[in-house]
Swiss-Prot record:
The organism's taxonomic lineage, starting at the top: Bacteria, Bacillati, Bacillota, Bacilli, Bacillales
InterPro entries to which the protein is assigned, alphabetical: AAA+_ATPase, ABC_transporter-like_ATP-bd, P-loop_NTPase, Siderophore_ABC-ATPase
Protein's job: Part of an ABC transporter complex involved in ferric-petrobactin uptake. Probably responsible for energy coupling to the transport system.
Species this protein is from: Bacillus anthracis
Gene: fatE
Protein name per UniProt: Petrobactin import ATP-binding protein FatE
Gene Ontology terms for molecular function: ATP binding; ATP hydrolysis activity
Length: 250
């Protein structure tokens, strides 16, 4: 479980995130949605300890994020930021291998190599594993980064806008991979999403944010509400109930 207790982040006297209070259940897929500036990425970065909170406490798997040792936290939690600066002379396999660093400290074992191959195959990268990152398309490179974080084999996986710069087909492919990771590997996946309908189709829970606050948290059916989403996004949003679940029309 990810437990966020009275967490606040201050930027100026007028701009702040929180107080945030939420418990995200273990296993499954949870999406953070909301307009730009709502605090989604800030919240994700605080959970991943890439950004300090000013008040409150965050626990992941009963570990205090602020107090835990990095080497211990790295075996429980991994995070992929929206922007990643890659080394061009790095192959896909070498990149994915970085996911094993918390365990091997750079000295890959035979077991590590098996795990690396597992996630390269899982993300359909086998034919690309010896290609350099600068030879890949944006979608292929994004899959390589996701393979790297999954290769870390942490129970909790945080992803900041994993569909960034992906077209519709590649976005569907990515979401199907992440959904499978939650189902087949029992991962707890928390991701920042801009597309409401992708969040609705693939998530178990949705957390909607506005103005640094949690506006709603619940099942897809609970959050996919016309009145609620219209207020959050400040534009008219209609919800259509269909055979594949609720769809937002705006």
């Amino acid at each position: 479980m990810i437990k966020i207790d009275n967490v606040k982040k201050f930027y100026t006297d007028k701009v702040k995130i929180g107080p945030l209070d939420i418990e995200i259940p273990k296993a499954g897929f949870t999406s953070l949605i909301g307009p730009n500036g709502a605090g989604k990425s800030t919240t994700l970065l605080m959970i991943g300890r890439l950004l300090d909170m000013d008040e409150g406490q965050i626990q992941v798997a009963n570990m205090d994020v602020s107090e835990s040792k990095s080497k211990d936290l790295a075996k429980v939690l991994t995070i992929l930021r929206q922007e990643n600066h890659f080394v061009t002379r790095l192959t896909v396999r070498q990149l994915v291998g970085f996911g094993r660093f918390p365990y091997s400290k750079g000295r890959l074992t035979k077991e590590d190599e098996v795990i690396i191959s597992k996630y390269i195959d899982f993300l359909d990268l086998t034919n690309l594993e010896n290609r350099y990152l600068d030879e890949l398309s944006g979608g292929q490179r994004q899959r390589a980064y996701v393979a790297m974080v999954l290769c870390q084999e942490t129970e909790y996986v945080l992803l900041d806008e994993p569909l960034n710069n992906l077209d519709v087909a590649r976005s569907v492919q990515m979401m199907e991979h992440l959904r499978r990771a939650a189902n087949e590997f029992g991962r707890t996946i928390l991701t920042v999403m801009h597309d409401i309908n992708f969040a609705a189709k693939y998530s178990d829970k949705i957390c909607a944010m506005k103005d640094g606050q949690i506006a709603a948290f619940g099942t897809v059916e609970e959050v996919m509400d016309s009145t609620l989403l219209t207020d959050i996004f400040e534009t008219r949003i209609e919800i259509i109930k269909g055979p594949y679940g609720p769809i937002a029309v705006y």
